[in-house]
């Protein structure tokens, strides 16, 4: 079974990486539809592989064993599953409370802000996709060795909808919500299957769909964010400590005063037949403040979008610190040192003031996935927290750092 676990994890994560590279650049409902389509296609594929038993599946799967001790009964596997759930929750909490986790949560409001802070939205989405595949592979392995049988049936589109309902009932974006939602939906499903045949003989299958649909509508009406966030609003908030002084984060090399930093040469940006930026050229040197002045609709915001990579110029060249950034991704331009603000506020309302400001330290920090998951990033995290607090205190918001934005 342990070789099977290794193969399941590596193959699933590899396939998820390939599928993610192919589909994660899609936006909105197109992304959701593509993942559903992949699920249907792969389920149909495995259901027609003769070596895997087609839709009849594979039977006589050996139980999970530790040496000579085998977990034969469901009760024995039950405790193993809860141990794994506890470990996943701990790792998930560590990850979401880290540099990468803040970037993941910030994606909930769109790509524009995160890209402007030096965060590659595509890479973070791909990371989330692979982590989800890793957990799915682990769950499938446990399911197969607990049931001693596996087939494509339990992984069809209907189960996908059920998993979505679990997430929404418990609270999407909440670790505890995933567990609570799974427990509620599973218990309700079992109760409905037990009692509906007594109420309506011969029509229990249709009534089960009606019952779950009614439940779904009620949650959308009264607890749209899910049970855990809904209940959390009425519970006393945990008091969080104030960040302690910590070493400063590393700074990039500073240019010499008067050195040429930014050169824009003949920049032009068109939207169909409309020329928003027409043959603009200027230089910006270190220590210099340059203002772009013009009436509404003159193209000022479009020019800034071109400078920061949110838009591409149709003609011309933009050079920063001796390197052309005309075709660079927005996140790479931000990492190079060009920052921006927005006319319309793009704060993340479900993150605290401190966490919102800490997003700005992403390009100056380096902690990766494993260190974040195991909380090996305490020194860097402390520096990022203290830097964010220092900036909040500059504008008089230090006492409200843990308030939601």
Residue ranges and their predicted role:
Residues 326-327, 391-405:
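Conserved ABC nucleotide-binding domain
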Residues 290-295:
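The feature captures the beta-strand-to-loop junction immediately N-terminal to the Walker
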Residues 316-324, 335-336:
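Conserved ABC transporter NBD signature motif
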């Amino acid at each position: 079974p342990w070789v099977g676990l290794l193969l399941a994890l590596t193959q699933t994560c590899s396939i998820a990486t390939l599928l993610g590279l192919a589909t994660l650049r899609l936006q909105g409902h197109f992304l959701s539809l593509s993942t559903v389509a992949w699920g249907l296609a792969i389920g149909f594929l495995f259901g027609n592989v003769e070596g895997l038993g087609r839709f009849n599946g594979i039977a006589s799967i050996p139980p999970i064993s530790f040496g000579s001790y085998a977990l034969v009964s469901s009760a024995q596997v039950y405790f193993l599953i809860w141990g794994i759930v506890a470990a996943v929750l701990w790792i998930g909490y560590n990850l979401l409370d880290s540099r990468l986790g803040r970037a993941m949560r910030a994606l909930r409001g769109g790509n524009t802000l995160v890209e402007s802070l030096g965060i590659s939205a595509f890479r973070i989405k791909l990371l989330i996709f692979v982590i989800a595949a890793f957990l799915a592979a682990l769950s499938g392995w446990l399911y197969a060795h607990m049931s001693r049988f596996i087939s494509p049936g339990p992984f069809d589109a209907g189960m996908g909808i059920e998993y979505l309902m679990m997430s929404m009932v418990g609270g999407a974006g909440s670790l505890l919500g995933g567990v609570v939602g799974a427990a509620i939906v599973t218990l309700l499903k079992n109760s409905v299957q037990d009692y509906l045949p007594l109420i309506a003989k011969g029509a229990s299958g249709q009534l089960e769909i009606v019952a779950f649909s009614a439940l779904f509508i009620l949650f959308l009406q009264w607890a749209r964010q899910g049970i855990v966030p809904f209940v959390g609003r009425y519970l006393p908030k945990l008091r969080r400590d104030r960040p302690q002084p910590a070493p400063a984060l590393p700074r990039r090399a500073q240019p010499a005063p008067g050195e040429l930093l930014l050169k824009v040469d003949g920049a032009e940006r068109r939207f169909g037949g409309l020329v928003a930026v027409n043959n603009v050229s200027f230089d910006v040197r270190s220590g210099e403040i340059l203002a772009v002045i013009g009436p509404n609709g003159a193209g000022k915001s479009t020019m800034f979008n071109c400078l920061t990579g949110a838009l591409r110029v149709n003609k011309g060249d933009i050079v920063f610190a001796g390197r052309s950034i005309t075709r660079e991704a927005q996140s790479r331009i931000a990492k190079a040192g060009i920052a921006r603000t927005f006319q319309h506020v793009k704060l993340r309302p479900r993150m605290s003031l401190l966490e919102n400001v800490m997003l700005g330290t992403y390009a100056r920090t380096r902690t990766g996935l494993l260190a974040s998951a195991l909380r090996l990033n305490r020194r860097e995290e402390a520096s990022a927290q203290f830097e964010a607090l220092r900036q909040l205190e500059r504008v008089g918001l230090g006492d409200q750092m843990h308030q939601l934005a």
